[in-house]
Regions:
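Short, charged, surface-exposed secondary-structure boundary motifs
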Residues: 13-22, 106
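A short alpha->loop->secondary-structure connector
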Residues: 1-8
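Short acidic, glycine/serine/threonine-rich loops at helix termini
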Residues: 1, 17-20, 46-49
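Short, solvent-exposed amphipathic alpha-helical segments in soluble enzyme
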Residues: 1, 22-25, 132-136
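Long, compositionally biased charged/polar accessory segments in the mid-to-C-terminal portions
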Residues: 29-199
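Short, well-ordered alpha-helical segments in soluble proteins
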Residues: 12-13, 26-27, 87
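Short, flexible loop/turn elements at secondary-structure junctions
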Residues: 9-12, 100
Length: 199
């Protein structure tokens, strides 16, 4: 009776091998203690060595090749494409994750992020009530969460880009395979970077 189960909404997990291959070898030699995908509420990909952010490896997520591949779903593990937990039927007392697709709300600073909490059982309701005094919460339509969170409906779908990357990777390696799988995305990323730094 004292056990509560909580599950995360997972959009997919790339292999650690891809992360290592995306980081320059001279940086990998450093004593990396932490990796941040958000820093001070900003969407930046940062590597941290001995509590100091490495200035040579901190960039907006929109300008990072590893994150570009992740957001386009081409570096997920094969098991992510057939995940038994990505469905409407939930297995835990409570489900938590980012609230993508949130519409009108009383929250004034939505850019700091809003969490989604799904209460699936009576035990989940008990757990939520135990925490409610420390939270600001709004009851939302269940469909609002379903519409913008693909893993709440089904596993992430395999794309043509995914097939291109997986076919080329054994022969050309990580970065070259991404260039072939994401030529338009990478070109747009480079143009944006050039324009920003050559005003």
């Amino acid at each position: 009776p004292n056990l509560f189960t909580v599950e995360l909404i997972c959009h997919g997990v790339p292999s650690c091998k891809f992360l290592k291959e995306s980081i320059p070898s001279n940086i990998l030699k450093k004593r990396i203690k932490q990796i941040n995908f958000r820093s001070n509420s900003q969407y930046k990909f940062s590597l941290i060595e001995d509590n100091q952010i490495l200035p040579s490896y901190q960039r907006p997520l929109s300008n990072d090749l590893y994150m570009k591949a992740f957001f386009n779903g081409i570096t997920y593990r094969p098991s992510c494409l057939s995940c038994h937990f990505a469905r409407k039927e939930r297995n835990a007392d409570m489900t938590i994750g980012d609230f993508w697709g949130l519409k009108s709300t009383k929250i004034t600073d939505i850019n700091k992020g809003v969490s989604l909490v799904l209460i699936n059982t009576n035990a989940g309701k008990t757990l939520f009530n135990l925490c409610s005094d420390s939270l600001y919460s709004e009851e939302r339509p269940y469909k609002e969460a379903l519409d913008a969170n693909e893993p709440l409906n089904h596993p992430i779908k395999k794309s043509i880009r995914y097939n291109v990357f997986r076919t080329l990777y054994p022969h050309f390696g990580y970065k070259y395979s991404l260039f072939f799988a994401l030529p338009d995305k990478i070109l747009a990323m480079k143009i944006k970077y050039y324009l920003k730094h050559n005003k």
